[in-house]
Amino acid sequence: MFHDTLVPCAERQNINMKKIVLYHGTPDKVFTPTYGKGNEKHDYGKGFYLTESIDLAKEWAVCRPNEENGWVHKYELDCKDLKVLDFQKLSVLTWLAELMKHRDAADSKRYRMLAAKFIEKYGVETEGYDVIKGWRANASYFYIAKEFVRDNIDIDILEELLSLGGLGIQYCIKSEKAYNNLHELKEELVPVDYSEFNERYNDRDVTARKNMRDLINSDANEVTKVFSTLL
């Protein structure tokens, strides 16, 4: 059964603000976010993805192995009256269920059958939300998802595994209303050097994978409450 939860965007702030600053890393100097665009195979489906961290945005701008410099575009999001789905406030299983809607963690018949049941049990209905916020499932985070559906990870260590990545929280702008509330601060466009920040991106990924493998192979991973037992 799908569940439903609403998180006012302003709750993200330590002070009572209605606007937040977000960054988008891209190879493109000229870029216009467009409602209805994007890839359905991304973590939360079609949408425009941003982060609160300018350093992570710089890494994401040059994460491709093409040796081209990138750009970070700075935006201000007016959160007034926006409905936000925050996966950090929900079970990690709910986040994994959302990934399974859009990305395949395995290509076996067993996975396809179990994934449908998992999504039905732990998924949430995302229609009607203006913004989705949660972990970014890049290579190392998706490594967790793949190992989990292979029954190699106990649920008791899932949240700790996610904390090891340090690879960032993202915002996905979903609705036309949210797009209209997003405004670029064009005078604050930042160039990104490929050699410096691609190396940082790769180093972060290598370190995350090592730490994750170490935890998965440790005694803390009892491999008792695993994917197939949670249905």
Which stretches of residues belong to each language-model region?
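Short, flexible loop/turn elements at secondary-structure junctions
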Residues: 26-27, 48, 54, 77-81
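Short aromatic-glycine-(Arg/Gly/Cys) micro-motifs in beta-strand/loop hairpins
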Residues: 9, 17-41
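Extended catalytic/binding region for NAD+/ADP-ribose chemistry, centered on the ART fold
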Residues: 39-64
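Solvent-exposed, flexible loop/coil residues
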Residues: 34, 39, 48, 175-177
